[in-house]
Amino acid sequence: MLYSLARPMLFSLAPERAHELTLSMLKTAHKMGMLRQTIQPKPVTCMGIEFPNPVGLAAGLDKNGAYIDALAGLGFGFIEIGTITPRPQSGNPKPRLFRIPEAKAIINRMGFNNEGVDQLVENVKAAKFRGILGINIGKNADTPVENAVDDYLICLEKVYNYASYITVNISSPNTKNLRSLQSGDALTELLETLKKRQLELAEQYHHYVPLVLKVAPDLTHEDIQFISEQLLTFKIDGLIVTNTTLSREGVENLPFGNEAGGLSGAPVFEKSTECLRSFAKVLNDQIPLIGVGGITQGEHAVAKKDAGASLVQIYSGLIYTGPDLIKECVSAIT
């Protein structure tokens, strides 16, 4: 595809600039009617939703929902936008995004840079896309972690009518103390409060929107056991496994390999897939799983499915392989 020709030029730019330029080029191509990648339908029913195919876009590429229609032209079975926070925030200081091409890896410490939930809602309302849209929600960096539930409630209420499902992101390593919400009373309070509000909104709008949790790969067996118990207790609708890792296995001696932030791409594949397998074993098909982390070829998508995933998501693999990866993954999954 054309991406193989454009990639050397994009990789000559700073990663964040290349990210912005790629999205801009996609939007232009879409407006010109040049984005029509045909993907063979492979319907999957998950969380009460019928997905046209099981391969989705992970959150982080389109944080503000400004490129939904263009991304839809690539043939994803579903698109997840965000992470969004109640108020706009600029994120962490630049540089904060690093390519490690030798390992097909990326390190980011973006810090939930976004234009705020109100702008995202306006962008979603303006989009023509009528497919499956996930909206990923988080907390503002300056909100104390003990008040985090308030930020999640604000976002939940504002995006509820515009999302096919809503992802609660408590696993980014780039917002101080965010991962502490994955354990103990903090997780219990968060899930209990959000589930209660979800059910109230479902009754108010006569429309049920599934609630999904996104977790990190850096979890112990005890963590996995506890999180699983909480998911079942509060009847959370799905689990995304996993976010980026703090591990540097596979990139230790490479340029930028020791930059702070979350590592994604090929090196996280084994770790995230093992985490997925562990959750699948504990949950025993009681909650659907979405596998993400290190998918750079079709066989990786199959491995996620074999480990227990009903759906998969890709992001970093797209940067190295291009949109052909979507079709490859859909074709590989039987």
Swiss-Prot record:
Binding of FMN, residues: A59, G60, L61, D62, K63, T83, N136, N169, K214, T242, G265, G294, Y315, S316
Q: Where is the active site?
A: S172 (nucleophile)
Task: Tell me how the cofactor is bound.
Answer: Binds 1 FMN per subunit.
> What keywords does the record list, in alphabetical order?
Cell membrane, Flavoprotein, FMN, Membrane, Oxidoreductase, Pyrimidine biosynthesis
Against PROSITE patterns, the record matches this protein to:
DHODEHASE_1
Cited SUPFAM superfamilies: FMN-linked oxidoreductases (SSF51395)
Q: Which InterPro entries match?
A: Aldolase_TIM (IPR013785), DHO_dehydrogenase (IPR050074), Dihydroorotate_DH_1_2 (IPR012135), Dihydroorotate_DH_2 (IPR005719), Dihydroorotate_DH_cat (IPR005720), Dihydroorotate_DH_CS (IPR001295)
Query: Could you tell me the Gene Ontology terms of the biological process aspect for this record?
Result: 'de novo' pyrimidine nucleobase biosynthetic process; 'de novo' UMP biosynthetic process
Catalyzed reactions per annotation: (S)-dihydroorotate + a quinone = orotate + a quinol
State the source organism's domain of life: Bacteria
* GO molecular function annotation: dihydroorotate dehydrogenase (quinone) activity
One Pfam family in the UniProt entry: DHO_dh
Matches recorded under CDD domains: DHOD_2_like (cd04738)
The record's subcellular location field reads: Cell membrane
The pathway is: Pyrimidine metabolism; UMP biosynthesis via de novo pathway; orotate from (S)-dihydroorotate (quinone route): step 1/1
Residues noted as binding substrate in the record, renumbered to the chain: K63, N108, R109, M110, G111, F112, N169, N174, N243, T244
User: EC number(s)?
Assistant: 1.3.5.2
Coiled-coil positions are: none
Q: How does it assemble?
A: Monomer.
What family is it from? Answer: Belongs to the dihydroorotate dehydrogenase family. Type 2 subfamily.
Q: Kindly give the NCBIfam families that the UniProt entry links to this protein.
A: PRK05286.1-1, PRK05286.1-2, PRK05286.1-4, PRK05286.2-5, pyrD_sub2
Summarizing the function annotation, the protein's role is: Catalyzes the conversion of dihydroorotate to orotate with quinone as electron acceptor.
Protein name as it appears in the record? Dihydroorotate dehydrogenase (quinone)
Its ancestry begins with: Bacteria, Pseudomonadati, Pseudomonadota, Gammaproteobacteria, Moraxellales
